[in-house]
Amino acid sequence: MNTQEIIEALAMLREKKPLVVNITNYVVMNNTANALLALGASPIMAHSQQEMAEMMSFSGALVINIGTLDSVWTPRMHFAVEQANLNNKVVVLDPVGCGASQLRTQTARQIAEAANTLIIRGNASEIIALAGENAQSKGVDALDSSDSALGAACYVAQQYQCSVVISGETDYVVTKEAQYKLNNGHAMMPFVTGMGCTHTALTGAFAAIGDHSGVAATAVLGVAGEIAAEQSAGPGSLQINLLDTLYQLDEETLMNRLKLTVNA
């Protein structure tokens, strides 16, 4: 995927306004729903198993975020993945805090194993832990650099036959065909809770219109976050400015600002 294809994907997303089913955490529901709306997608936060078969029959993609995981949520997540598979829909998994507890690590691996078409989006420590290596994390925050997770991402991509997105100071996307390096974003972004969860939700929106790599969402959020941070005094205003920037983001801005390197 190149810059022009990312621009075309954004235009298609805004035209089609895909419905994205989110089983996500309590902390970020408002953030991620607003980000999806600002970009042009249609979010629904559906957590009931009783309606999931219907939801997956007409939605574009399924986003699963294990940020506030518990025994009530887990069977719902597994059932949702089953329904996504039955309807040939992409599953986007955010393994929040993978490596911080056995519950999170095991659940993330089980979901990844179950999904037929999968994108995994996490920080470096989460991806390293998912691969079964020793990671440095503090709760859900990464202490590993994104560069250090590249080997783990390649392993995870092979293990689960999926695309892997590593968020960090530098973002990486690993697919079967290529590795992508993206150098946008801003150092202020990690000070807003749920920024990675927003990244995952946007990945679901682009997956719903055909980008099964995660590259388009990574590019769009990186450029939008960079611009929004330049206009912000701190994390509070960054949250608001990010929504405005996602809404206003255009072809010329992406073309001029995106820093994308592709290694095929």
UniProtKB/Swiss-Prot annotation:
Family to which this protein belongs: Belongs to the Thz kinase family.
InterPro entries (UniProt xref): Hyethyz_kinase, Ribokinase-like
Listed EC numbers: 2.7.1.50
Record GO biological process: thiamine biosynthetic process; thiamine diphosphate biosynthetic process
Binding site for ATP: R121, S167
Residue pairs linked by disulfide bridges in the UniProt entry: none
Protein's recorded name: Hydroxyethylthiazole kinase
Role description: Catalyzes the phosphorylation of the hydroxyl group of 4-methyl-5-beta-hydroxyethylthiazole (THZ).
Co-factor(s): Mg(2+)
Residues engaged in binding substrate: M45, G194
Catalytic activity, reaction form: 5-(2-hydroxyethyl)-4-methylthiazole + ATP = 4-methyl-5-(2-phosphooxyethyl)-thiazole + ADP + H(+)
Keywords, sorted A to Z: ATP-binding, Kinase, Magnesium, Metal-binding, Nucleotide-binding, Thiamine biosynthesis, Transferase
Pathway where this protein functions: Cofactor biosynthesis; thiamine diphosphate biosynthesis; 4-methyl-5-(2-phosphoethyl)-thiazole from 5-(2-hydroxyethyl)-4-methylthiazole: step 1/1
Gene Ontology molecular-function annotations: ATP binding; hydroxyethylthiazole kinase activity; magnesium ion binding
Lineage of producing organism: Bacteria, Pseudomonadati, Pseudomonadota, Gammaproteobacteria, Vibrionales
Pfam family, one: HK
